[in-house]
Amino acid sequence: RTKDYCGKCGRKSFGKMQDIDFFYEKGKLEVCTIVKEPTNKFTKLGAYIYGIISFHNGKVRVPGRLTDHILKDEELALSCIEDREVVPRFRRRYAVEQSDIIPTISLAFTFADEYYPYQKHEVVKPNKKYETPGIVGYGVYVSKFRIKEDSIERSIPFMDEDSITAAVEAGKLALIHSGVDPSLIGKVYVGSESNPYAVKPIASKVAQVLKLGEEEKSDGVQGVDAVDTEFACKAATSMFKDAAALTYYPTAHIPYAMVIGTDNSQAAPRDEPGGELDFFVGYGASAFIFGMHDVIAELEGWYSCTSDTPDFWRRDLEPYPRHGGRFTGEPAYFKHIAKSAKKLMEKLRLQPSDLDYFVCHQPNIRFPIKVAKELGFKEEQYIDGLQVVKFGNTYSGASPIGLAAILDKAKPNQRILVASYGSGAG
């Protein structure tokens, strides 16, 4: 965020400056330099590029750091990257001690034509109203960096990323995709089990950066209800029905609700107890906007089941989760996924052949394929949602990212069954 002003007189009009948010805009890297010996707070970044970025055809200039860029030992010709277009990214500002507040900034930058290309944010007025609520828009964010092993790739965060930054980026993409006015979002849920804070919500940061709800500029607050949820890997999907119900309930006065699943999935080193998880953990987030207008996927029904099954856990103050070995399979994952999917199909009087797509929680490659086959689904029904092979197990983002992949190609009147799972268990 910065101020737009006249380069000659220093005023916008009538002696007032205009408050502008550049987070959705595209700029140009005018000049830059390489910081080869960062100060203590930036040491973990290594050498990085710092420059001047201009917006609005050079009328506004701000300093900024180029992120997602690893400088090699060889010299980089700065003239090759100057004058290239860049887009703002939400990142950690610099490294701090474990007990400190994490500083963030929405004006770190990446090149506009790389990985996540620039997309214009255009607010569209609500048009058609549906009888039942559903998904209005969605967005997925995963890092550009990967670790590839055998048949799986795992997304890993850059040094200035975490579950908070991924949540903001996914929410931003959902707003761009839907065209929804951020001020009309009255509720935001963020589900995660890797919040960098033990006590401090992610949702409040998302609401502030994305300007969700009516903005009270004088007080610096957003008129939105923001809350974090936690239930292992189903922390986000469990809020789908709550978000949809709120937009349907007339006296709630909530036109739209946003649900985000975000995780920087954790695992112990491979030579320690619980280290088997490290073969599959990934990083990413997905965001869905629910409402009654311009619905792209209606919510037809749901079913949930829960049991106190200790198949996966992390005790307070412990850095890594533990799991119950083979106990995480039949008595936990498979039982709950199969039970919920069968009961929902029974409730809606559907057979697997009546559905076009099936997506479920994806802790690895084998589990979702096995449960899909046991339920009677064919490969063409579940393969498109199997995103664990590209990004790893993104925990709270896993089945939602699979759903987003299916929505990318699904056609009108096709049916999708989503069966999420959270260890603990439900």
Q: Where is each model-derived feature located?
A:
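Cys/His-rich short segments
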Residues: 1-24
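Short coil-to-beta-strand transition motifs
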Residues: 17-28, 79-84
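Glycine-rich active-site loops that engage anionic ligands at enzyme catalytic sites
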Residues: 29-72
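Short nucleic-acid-contacting surface segments enriched for D/E, G, S/T with interspersed K/R
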Residues: 69-89
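OB-fold/S1-family single-stranded nucleic acid-binding modules
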Residues: 81, 89-121
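Condensing-enzyme catalytic core mediating Claisen C-C bond formation in acyl metabolism
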Residues: 118-161, 273-331, 335-342, 347
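Conserved catalytic cysteine-centered active-site region
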Residues: 154-162, 194-256, 262, 370-402
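Phosphate/pyrophosphate-binding loops at sites that engage ATP/ADP/AMP, CoA/4′-phosphopantetheine
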Residues: 170-186, 338-354, 375, 410
